[in-house]
Structure formats: structure tokens, C-alpha cells
A protein has these predicted regions:
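Extracellular interaction modules
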Residues: 1-3
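A structural boundary/capping signal
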Residues: 5-111
Length: 111
């Protein structure tokens, strides 16, 4: 079973922005790309870093580092220490515009 703690450890050097961006281009319907900040786990405990995932209804889809993590949003936010005020949300049409403009997968508006 894939554990969220393992995902958060790997994403510090992972492919989360690309994986989430690619997932958004494949999905149909109403989904949201999120660029946010998460708390590190394990070796990264005590550190916050940028991360990307996709939300659909009340589920987070985190396909970074070859994983296919799909968990309830409340659980993901609780374990990752995600705060809505730290996140940037992009509707279905926005990511492609940002990718073409910035020429990278993100983050685009986070410093």
C-alpha cells in the first residue's frame, strides 16, 4: 500500500509539478490543479516545500514519482499540513496557458 508519508519524503526531489500538470491534460471534467506547500515527513520533517497535486471533488490525486495516490482531500491536507491560504488553485483551462507562457510545469505563482 502506498503511504502518504512516503510520497511526501520523495517529492522534495521529485516530479510532482510535471506529473500533476500532465494528469490535468489527460483528465476530462471539472478538476483543479493545486500548487501548494506541504510539511516534510521522515528525513524531511520540520521542512516545508512546494508540491503539486490534482483535486477532483473531495479526492486528491497525487501521481508524482510514478505513484498513483488517491486519497480523501481532508486526510491529505491533514497529513501534509496543507493550508488553503498557501495554495494556488488552477481550473481545468488554466494550466495549459501557464505551461505555454512559463515554458515549465511550475510552480508559477509561488515564491
Amino acid at each position: 500500500m502506498i503511504k502518504l508519508n512516503n510520497i511526501l519524503l520523495e517529492v522534495a526531489t521529485g516530479d510532482c509539478y510535471q506529473a500533476a500538470g500532465r494528469l490535468m491534460t489527460k483528465l476530462r471534467g471539472d478538476h483543479t490543479l493545486v500548487h501548494g506547500m506541504v510539511n516534510g515527513q521522515g528525513a524531511l520533517e520540520g521542512k516545508r516545500f512546494g508540491h503539486a497535486w490534482v483535486e477532483t471533488n473531495d479526492t486528491v490525486l497525487d501521481h508524482s514519482n510514478g505513484k498513483k495516490l488517491e486519497v480523501p482531500k481532508d486526510l491529505y491536507y491533514a497529513i501534509g499540513g496543507c493550508r488553503k491560504e498557501d495554495n494556488k488553485y488552477y481550473n481545468t483551462d488554466e494550466p495549459l496557458k501557464w505551461i505555454l507562457k512559463a515554458k515549465h510545469w511550475g510552480p508559477w505563482e509561488m515564491s
